[in-house]
Amino acid sequence: MDNIKEHEWGREIVWSAKENYCGKILVFEKAEKSMPLHFHKSKEKSWFVNAGAFLITWVDTADGKAYSKELPEGSVFEIPALTPVKLQALQDNSAMAECSNSSEDDFYKIGL
């Protein structure tokens, strides 16, 4: 299907893609799988954990420090544009809804 994109960490299911809005479900079938550290130049995101749990790590660009937080089921987390972020599943079959202000490809991987 055109609305499902497979990744090393799992898959994303796009349920809405408008000019200024995008809605996705991110599915991590295996614990310990993670997205690479990355940022978006203009995209802002909000996440809601539907199932399982995640560890989110982000860099506060104001102080240059990395922070981590566990996100259990029911958690909400917002990511401003230009914020380096990494997401790792802590349980098998973890999933979250993602809403963002854009559906354009605005993904910049950090590191190797």
Task: Write out the residue ranges for each language-model feature.
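A short, N-terminal "cap"/entry segment at the start of jelly-roll beta-barrel domains
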Residues: 1-25, 34-36, 69, 112
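Glycine- and acidic-residue-biased ligand/ion/polar-headgroup-sensing regions
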Residues: 41-61
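Well-ordered beta-strand positions in beta-sheet-rich domains
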Residues: 46, 68-70, 84, 93
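Short beta-strand His + acidic residue motifs that chelate non-heme Fe in jelly-roll/DSBH
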Residues: 35-38, 56-58, 77-79, 84-90, ...
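Double-stranded beta-helix
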Residues: 5, 86-112
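Residue-level "contact hotspot" at macromolecular interaction interfaces
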Residues: 27-28, 48, 70, 78
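Short, well-structured hydrophobic secondary-structure segments
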Residues: 25-47
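Short acidic-glycine-tyrosine-enriched beta hairpin
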Residues: 60-82
